[in-house]
Amino acid sequence: MKYMMFTVLLVWLLAVPTQARQPDDYWNSPRSTYEERRALFLDYYSENGSGHPLYGVFRQAARAASGRPLEMDKMREVISVIKSNRDCNDFTLNCLLRMVYLDKKQSFFPTEIKGSIEECILDFKYWWDDGRRDTTYRCYHTENHQALYHTAELLAGQLYKKTKFTNGMNGKQHMAHAKERLMKWLEYRFRFGFSEWMSTYYEVEVLLLANLYDFAEDTDIRSKAGMVLDLLMFDVEIGRAHV
């Protein structure tokens, strides 16, 4: 009996790699409508999305989009991450800002948390030329981080045009500071493509480009963001189709 079990196990182990090399099944067209697929994704991610402090905000965004109540303990973690000097919290802030803009259309933030959200947006360090010293390493210079910081600064400035931020600049000044840098970034992406091409950073670049396209008040920025987003998706399709 033990030899039979060994034989079965050996055959199974040999079969697994062979099976893994078989072509994947796929369809040339979706099996359901866009709204059905969107609802399925939001339902799944609302319950199973990342709980990591940097990325937990995306689960909360999915919950808001699907009509579920926010997890307040997780939202407090989101605010804490943004108020910290932690590297990559520009990912977190860009998603939170998207939620803030969507909340203006259909309210889902509880009243008791809105003050803390505003405080962390006004206090954020939006670029390395802010006089406040970083207490930990923060990456500003790579392709995705450049635009994440500038997008967050533009959208934050739009929200609080006349309000003084912690660094002494008001919202309009932040908008001007961000626009100058964003226009150059968008021009370079459209002319030369992405230096972080076909990388996992595309997902955060989709986020920032969608934020600009959906919420930027400047029509030129909005138009250019749409064109660069089209270019990014074209890159993805070329890779998928093995052209």
Locations of the language-model features?
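Bacterial N-terminal signal peptides
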Residues: 5-15
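A composition/secondary-structure signal for short, hydrophobic, low-basic-content segments
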Residues: 15, 33-34, 67-72
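Boundary at the C-terminal end of the N-terminal hydrophobic targeting segment
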Residues: 18-20
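Extended, charge-biased low-complexity segments
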Residues: 23-28, 35, 40-42, 59-62
